Regions:
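Active-site-flanking segments in enzyme catalytic domains
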Residues: 3-9, 13-182
Length: 182
């Protein structure tokens, strides 16, 4: 769809319907003469007028594709329990992507509810570099400096939750769809 779609408080980048169809929105924003792709930065600057094809389109395609997979075959319900007490429901819009890992999420949007959390893990992992994924995991840990100035992990709950959920995503893809996420 050429134009954007909006809810009362956010822009809709894509939808997945009936286990068959994916719709992408705002494709008129693509600058075909000057494509911009950033797979190294896991925290997109959404104020940048140059639309990052990775964030706005490739990530969205994979995000919606993962919804299609989950509409066809449900993922294990154990996933829902890992962050059950920390989902933000409608307040996810106020969670900055760079702050989300400390709470165990790969993006602010992932903090909304389990289905979005699951597909965000998949879509961010497959559309970003290994160093971008490592940054998310690093940012999921609270770090302090010891007396020598060396970083010391003081709280790994965020990283631990992301890795636990990632393992479920990885196993689901392998066991349900014979997809190796790597």
């Amino acid at each position: 769809i050429g134009s954007g779609a909006y809810t009362e408080n956010s822009m809709v980048m894509g939808t997945a319907e009936g286990g068959l169809k994916i719709m992408l929105y705002n494709v008129n924003a693509i600058d075909i003469d000057n494509p911009y792709i950033d797979s190294d930065n896991p925290y997109q600057d959404k104020s940048n007028p140059n639309k990052d094809l990775n964030y706005y389109f490739f990530h969205t395609m994979h995000h919606e594709f993962a919804h299609i997979l989950c509409q066809k075959k449900s993922f294990p319900t154990d996933f829902n329990l890992i962050s059950a007490s920390t989902y933000k429901s409608t307040d996810w819009i106020n969670v900055k992507d760079a702050d989300a890992p400390k709470d165990g999420f790969v993006s602010g949007y992932a903090s909304g509810e389990a289905n979005e959390d699951f597909v965000e893990i998949y879509s961010i992992y497959v559309t970003h570099t290994a160093s971008a994924w490592a940054k998310i995991l690093h940012d999921g840990t609270v770090w302090t400096k010891d007396s020598t100035g060396k970083e010391v992990a003081t709280d790994t709950k965020g990283t631990d939750a992301i890795l636990e959920k990632f393992k479920i995503v990885e196993d689901y893809l392998k066991n349900s769809w014979n997809i190796d996420i790597d």
